[in-house]
Amino acid sequence: MNKKPVSYLQNDPRWKDKPYRVKGESSTVGSAGCGPTCAAMVIQTITGKTFTPEDACNWSIQHGYKALKQGTYYSYFKPQLAAFGIDCDQLDWTATYGKPNHQNHQRALELLKQGYYLIALMNKGAWTSSGHFVLVWWADGKIRINDPASTKDARVNGDPYDFRSQAKYYWWVDARKYNNEEDDDMTQDKFNEMFKTAMGAYRQELRDNDSGEWSKKAREYAVSS
C-alpha cells in the first residue's frame, strides 16, 4: 500500500501561466508541465519538503530536460528524483500502447503492491489527445491515479482495461521504506491504547519513586496546595 500522495495540478492558478519553455516556444506549466508535476507530487510526498510543479519545471529547464515544442524528455525523472535521494528508473523501453495484456502491466501492478509509485506515460485516449504523464499508486486493493491535469472521476478512477490499453511507458519510484513508516490517521482505539500505556508507565514511575526526599516533598506540596 502506498502513502496517499500529495495532489498537485499543473493548471493550478498559482503557476499555470508560469513559463515552462525553451527558446522558440511559449509553453507554460499549465500547458506542458505534466511530467514535472508528477515528479513534484512524488518528491513532496516522500521527503515532506515543499516542492511545487513550478519548482520542478524550473529544475527541468535548468538541467536541459524541456523538449522543444513538446513536453519533458523521458530522461528527466531519474535525475530529478535522484536529486532528492529517491531511486527511480524506466521500467523498460517496450511500448505497451494498445497492448492491454502485455506483461509490463503485470510487472507494474506487482511493483505498486510492493509500495512503489509509478509514473505512466499515457497516449491518445481517455487521458490525452497526444501524450500525458500521470502518477499511479496503490491503496485498499485498487489502482489510484493522480492526474496532474484533471480531478474528473473518469481520469482518476479510470477503467483498468482502458488504462492498460493507453499506457505506453512506466517509470518506477521506490517508495517502499517511506510507505512502511507509520502514517495512519489517529483513531480513538489507538489513542486509548496509547493513553493506557502511558498511564501504566506513569504509575510505575510513581511506585518506583514513592520513597525518600522526592516523595516527602511531593506529599508536602499536595497537602499545601
Stretch-by-stretch model annotation:
Residues E182-S225:
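N-terminal propeptides
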Residues Q44-N179:
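Conserved active-site-adjacent core of cysteine acyl-enzyme catalytic domains
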Residues M1-Q70, M186, G212:
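Active-site-adjacent structural segments surrounding the nucleophilic cysteine of cysteine proteases
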